Amino acid sequence: MISTEEKIEFLKRLVEIYSPTGKENGVAKFLIKSFENYGIEAYLDDVGNVIAVKKGKGPLILLAGHMDTVPGYIPVRIENGELWGRGAVDAKGPLATFFFATIESDANIIFAGLVDEEGFSKGAKNLEVPKPDYIIVGEPSGTNGVTIGYKGSLTVKFTETVEKVHGSIGVGAAEKLIEKWLTIAKYFGEGFNSLSGRIVKFVAYEREFDFFGEMIVNLRTPPGYMPPKEWDIIDFVPAYEVSRTSPLVRAFVRAIRKAGYKPKLKKKTGTADTNILGPKYGVDAIAYGPGDSKLDHTPYERIKLREYLEAIEILKNAILELSSND
């Protein structure tokens, strides 16, 4: 039996390894060494993902968390029962939860610590493991929450070139790009089933014979959305959702109730590796993990240690439910 203190110390050490996207190697080495300490072989795949396999009973379950964080170092400390640090919520708390659920469960589990989730999900897109029966992705849903849907993510580049005319007439490239943005933004709404977005890059300047402008936008897309074919698409990950009646969802509902909580099924307006891994393997995928997602990417990122420890037990019980019902 692994002690509470050991589980807290593991998470603290994991968060202390600063790992913005592209610099996940320190976390990878730590995970591989930690698995080996518990007698489980782990290795790096071709893109830098950490893979560990636990043999047991029941269906094959993929536990996929990510090792990278957004930039912005936060001094790591424990105060009032909370662990502060970059990645404590997004998503090293869930990753540590997956680590201990793998160690302590008597089930067929593939653990995957993925790279580049905060970038273009290179880790998920290039993951090559045997087809699982169920996929659980490590993202903060709250101890009593299960995320059953995420909006899609569409990154598009628009460019405009406008021949020079007298300054008192016509519009330049910047104005045309602004018109394009306003046309798109007319379709924005709130919630899971609406389009939303923001400008992530905008440059415009004068050249010798013309005006040039470039705008890159990121749109969060609802289920069923397909972009116009003429757009210059940099990256597109469609929306994803799983049925509330899925055996995977029902297993978590039972496990959360067993812990004394009322389950909350969530659909989020962000995007996660569920959007890639669910369609990639053609099986149901949800996201689960401790932490308040409102603290993602903020200077105030912190996780309640009690919730982290509870999430490990809930995840283990959900895995047990899946294994028992196979």
UniProtKB/Swiss-Prot annotation:
Binding-site residues for Zn(2+) 2, renumbered to this chain: D90, E118, H297
Pathway membership: Amino-acid biosynthesis; L-lysine biosynthesis via AAA pathway; L-lysine from L-alpha-aminoadipate (Thermus route): step 5/5; Amino-acid biosynthesis; L-arginine biosynthesis
The keyword Amino-acid biosynthesis appears for this protein: yes
Family designation: Belongs to the peptidase M20A family. LysK subfamily.
Keywords, sorted A to Z: Amino-acid biosynthesis, Arginine biosynthesis, Cobalt, Cytoplasm, Hydrolase, Lysine biosynthesis, Metal-binding, Zinc
Recorded catalytic activity of this chain's protein: [amino-group carrier protein]-C-terminal-gamma-(L-lysyl)-L-glutamate + H2O = [amino-group carrier protein]-C-terminal-L-glutamate + L-lysine; [amino-group carrier protein]-C-terminal-gamma-(L-ornithyl)-L-glutamate + H2O = [amino-group carrier protein]-C-terminal-L-glutamate + L-ornithine
PANTHER family the UniProt entry points to: [LYSW]-LYSINE_[LYSW]-ORNITHINE HYDROLASE (PTHR43808:SF28), ACETYLORNITHINE DEACETYLASE (PTHR43808)
Subcellular location(s) of the protein: Cytoplasm
NCBIfam families per record: dapE-lys-deAc, PRK04443.1
Alphabetized Pfam families for the sequence: Peptidase_M20
Cofactor note: Binds 2 Zn(2+) or Co(2+) ions per subunit.
Secretion signal, residue range per the UniProt entry: none
Gene Ontology biological process terms in this record: arginine biosynthetic process via ornithine; L-arginine biosynthetic process; lysine biosynthetic process via aminoadipic acid
EC number: 3.5.1.130, 3.5.1.132
Annotated GO CC locations: cytoplasm
Its job: Catalyzes the release of L-lysine from [LysW]-gamma-L-lysine and the release of L-ornithine from [LysW]-L-ornithine.
Cofactors required: Zn(2+); Co(2+)
Active site location: D68, E117
Gene from which the chain derives: lysK
Record: residues binding Zn(2+) 1: H66, D90, E139
Name of the protein in its database record: Putative [LysW]-lysine/[LysW]-ornithine hydrolase
An example molecular function term from Gene Ontology annotations: zinc ion binding
